[in-house]
């Protein structure tokens, strides 16, 4: 999670210091009251795997005790899960008779959630709440099965900041309820694109709940439903087909935002690479037996932070724009989010990779601040910000996204290397706080309980911190140490020693109220399709970390007879654990290192664990591996800080009335704008009568009807919600008229939901709509 994810906590700590002990006692009492029970998710079907090391990567007694604790089954945990008879696992003949390819299904579904009154997840900037929508967010699912239909794998790329453990556990639970053991922990990967402009509020660990300003069950349930629907669509639409792979570089769209950390890696290692970022894009092309397009998965290392932390519109950022362009091209005649072709631009080892290619500059003087501490002579680190290539963040998003789309399109068109061979999968739950890491045949070290360093609070050049923390800090500060110690208690000597040279700002692994602040139990997972291996990474690997893991996994496969494997780093998968740097980068303690929560040997631990998964697949011993300790599922979480209130229209007006109409005439390239009497858009998550907040419609004289030309998923539209006092609000719809717009008569429509509550009665959500007067678009 890039950039200043903890400014909310900084404000929280300062507030507590000022208000002194009385407020502290009250808050702690509240946290204890809100503490809920813990449920562990039991086996969801199939084999779930842990690994052993040679020498072993051992799990300590704490993990063993946790895994044997008597707790409730998750089969009864979710009251919202649809309980249906499991789908029988049967070969899908005669579809596959005399066929040697794969059975392929693709699906896409909306998972947008709230677009107002919720914090945007990624920057952690206090007050960066959603206030409208630029594009919809989607879950894109791809199912690949062997010819008899029984052995299959699922890859899902989701337009969210990252996959939370709670989200994955709930999805797996509902998949089990519907499909039995067909879709399981080991063969389903959930990956977040890492957009920093999606809603937060879907986490269960306290650090992320604070950054989200509470848990939003509405958004959580909408995300779960969207992910499941995309998998259902892919499952229903499976057909015989072929998969091809292609690779190629994408130039001019990324820089390393921590080059001084990268330089800590051995010169001999750096000399093997021409760049301090991974420029290679890997593309999977999926077609049916007639050669008709089905879908694309692309993996490329880039942070979706072209939209900066001043943005308040929900959107999928640069990678989402790339998906938008390719899907619109392949699904001609369909509105965005519709049509059979599905294109996912998935995340990879993007930890230190920025799309803001103009680099860091002091915004007050214009001079470069590309230094070890990312700080400016005047104003310090808060003035050091990197910018993208465009005139504004919208333009930069399009430029970077279009470049990725164009390269993926080229690689897709020229893909000729077919992916063949059996499918396999391996998964393990691991206690990452207690892994023995073998440095060589005789010496070992261990991972640590989670902790965040001082440079974490500094943020990055993509989104700086609110207080004057600096990257590259290897010493603490007495002022902040005192605040932390008074409110949270002192970190133990053990955790301080384990994390050196990181100066600990927050000893999250030793904080457990109202729930643990960070996860202990983490997923590691590999899926293979013939000669392709997809490693599901539970966080953000830096460039060199990804390179080392790829090489190690590839070498492990090769040592057991699986030569020439292509290993993909798939980022932000299954559970979020911040960053993973190399041991050498960790010593520099910039943002990424300070956010490597399990200590300096985190990468080495992951390399051991993923090598053992690769070995199990290569030697066909996956079934012999244990599943590992089970993660918790917390039932009660802190509610959102922003309450729901009744919507009100101005006197003499009603919801959807036009307050400011569009002008009578516009030229292409101009912006048509209409302002309506609005209501809180978060109501639409509860009552989904309408599937869009807006439409732009063109009058067709031949049919004497209005035809929709774009909606709120279209890049050229923007929906802004302006919150007033006492339930009053306005909604502004903008249509940035593209050069491709046909001349003619148009109108703009607004669709919303208002919250109404009569005295002594429960609140109800009512739908409404508004329509602007017609206006003309001309090309001259």
Curated annotation (Swiss-Prot):
Region of interest (Required for correct folding and localization), ranges: 770-780
Site entry (Cleavage), positions: 98-99
Positions annotated as glycosylated: 62, 67-68, 70, 73-74, 76, 78-80, 82, 84, 98, 151, 217, 308, 440, 468, 564, 730, 779
Enzyme class: hydrolase
Cofactors demanded by this protein: Zn(2+)
Keyword Phosphoprotein: yes
Modifications the protein undergoes after translation, according to the UniProt entry: Proteolytic cleavage of the N-terminus removes the signal-anchor and produces a soluble form of the protein. N-glycosylated. Required for enzyme activity.
Active site: 354 (nucleophile)
Disordered: annotated segments: 47-90
Role summary: Plasma membrane ceramidase that hydrolyzes sphingolipid ceramides into sphingosine and free fatty acids at neutral pH. Ceramides, sphingosine, and its phosphorylated form sphingosine-1-phosphate are bioactive lipids that mediate cellular signaling pathways regulating several biological processes including cell proliferation, apoptosis and differentiation. Also catalyzes the reverse reaction allowing the synthesis of ceramides from fatty acids and sphingosine.
Protein name: Neutral ceramidase
Source organism (scientific name): Homo sapiens
Organism lineage: Eukaryota, Metazoa, Chordata, Craniata, Vertebrata
């Amino acid at each position: 999670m890039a950039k200043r994810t903890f400014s909310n906590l900084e404000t929280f700590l300062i507030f507590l210091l000022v208000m002194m002990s009385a407020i502290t006692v009250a808050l702690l009492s509240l946290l204890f009251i809100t503490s809920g029970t813990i449920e562990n998710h039991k086996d969801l079907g199939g084999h779930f795997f842990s690994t052993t090391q040679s020498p072993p990567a051992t799990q300590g007694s704490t993990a063993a005790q946790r895994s044997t604790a008597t707790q409730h089954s998750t089969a009864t945990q979710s009251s919202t899960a649809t309980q249906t008879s499991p789908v029988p696992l049967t070969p899908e003949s005669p579809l596959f008779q005399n066929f040697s390819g794969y059975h392929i299904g693709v699906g896409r579904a909306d998972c947008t959630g709230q677009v107002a009154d919720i914090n945007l997840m990624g920057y952690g900037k206090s007050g960066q709440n959603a206030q409208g929508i630029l594009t919809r967010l989607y879950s894109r699912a791809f199912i690949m099965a062997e010819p008899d239909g029984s052995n299959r794998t699922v890859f899902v790329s989701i337009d969210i900041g990252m996959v939370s453990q709670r989200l994955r556990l709930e999805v797996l639970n509902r998949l089990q309820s519907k499909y039995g053991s067909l879709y399981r922990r080991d063969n389903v990967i959930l990956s977040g694109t890492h957009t920093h402009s999606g809603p937060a509020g879907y986490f269960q660990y306290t650090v992320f709940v604070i950054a989200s300003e509470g848990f939003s069950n509405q958004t959580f349930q909408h995300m779960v439903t969207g992910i499941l629907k995309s998998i259902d669509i892919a499952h229903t639409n499976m057909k015989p087909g072929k998969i091809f792979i292609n690779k190629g570089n994408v130039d001019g769209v990324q820089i390393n935002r921590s080059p001084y950390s990268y330089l800590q890696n051995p010169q001999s290692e750096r000399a093997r690479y021409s760049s301090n970022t991974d420029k290679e894009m890997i593309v999977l092309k999926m077609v049916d037996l007639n050669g008709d397009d089905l879908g694309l998965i692309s993996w490329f290392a880039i942070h979706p932070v072209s939209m900066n932390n001043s943005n308040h519109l929900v959107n999928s950022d640069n990678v989402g724009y790339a998906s938008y362009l390719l899907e619109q091209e392949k699904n001609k005649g369909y509105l965005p989010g519709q049509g059979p072709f599905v294109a996912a631009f998935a995340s990879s080892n993007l930890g230190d990779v920025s799309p803001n290619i103009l680099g860091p500059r002091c915004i007050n003087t214009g001079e470069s601040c590309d230094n070890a501490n990312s700080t400016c002579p005047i104003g310090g680190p808060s003035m050091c910000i990197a910018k993208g290539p465009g005139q504004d963040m919208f333009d930069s998003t399009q430029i970077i996204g279009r470049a990725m789309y164009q390269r993926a399109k080229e690689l897709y068109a020229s893909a000729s290397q077919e992916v063949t061979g059996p499918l396999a999968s391996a998964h393990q739950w691991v206690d990452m706080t207690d892994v023995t890491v073998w440095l060589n045949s005789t010496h070992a070290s261990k991972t640590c309980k989670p902790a965040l360093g001082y440079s974490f609070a500094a943020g990055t050049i993509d989104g700086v911190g609110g207080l004057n923390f600096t990257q590259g800090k290897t010493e603490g500060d007495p002022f902040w140490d005192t605040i932390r110690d008074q409110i949270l208690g002192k970190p133990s000597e053990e955790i301080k020693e384990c994390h050196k040279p990181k100066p600990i700002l927050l000893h999250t692994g030793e904080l457990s109220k109202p729930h643990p602040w960070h996860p202990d139990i983490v997923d590691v997972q590999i899926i293979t399709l013939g000669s392709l291996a997809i490693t599901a990474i539970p966080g953000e690997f830096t460039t060199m970390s990804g390179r080392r893991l790829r090489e190690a996994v590839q070498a492990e496969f090769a040592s057991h007879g699986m030569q020439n494997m292509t290993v993909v780093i798939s980022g932000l998968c299954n559970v979020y654990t911040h960053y993973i740097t190399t041991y050498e980068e960790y010593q520099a303690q910039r943002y990424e290192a300070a956010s490597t929560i399990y200590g300096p040997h985190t990468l080495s631990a992951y390399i051991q664990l993923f090598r053992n998964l690769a070995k199990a697949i290569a030697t066909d011993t996956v079934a012999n591996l244990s599943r590992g300790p089970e993660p918790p599922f917390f039932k009660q979480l802190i509610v959102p800080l922003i309450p729901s209130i009744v919507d009100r229209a101005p006197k003499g007006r009603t919801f959807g009335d036009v307050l400011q109409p569009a002008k009578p005439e516009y030229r292409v390239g101009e912006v048509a704008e209409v302002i309506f009497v609005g209501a809180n858009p978060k109501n639409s998550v509860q009552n989904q009568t309408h599937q869009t907040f807006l439409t732009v419609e063109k009058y067709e004289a031949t049919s004497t009807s209005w035809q929709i030309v774009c909606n709120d998923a279209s890049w050229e539209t923007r929906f802004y919600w302006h919150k007033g006092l006492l339930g009053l609000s306005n909604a502004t719809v903008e249509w940035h008229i593209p050069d491709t717009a046909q001349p003619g008569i148009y109108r703009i429509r607004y669709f919303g939901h208002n919250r109404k509550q009569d005295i002594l009665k429960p609140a109800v959500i009512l739908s409404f709509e508004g329509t602007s007067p017609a206006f003309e678009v001309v090309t001259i």
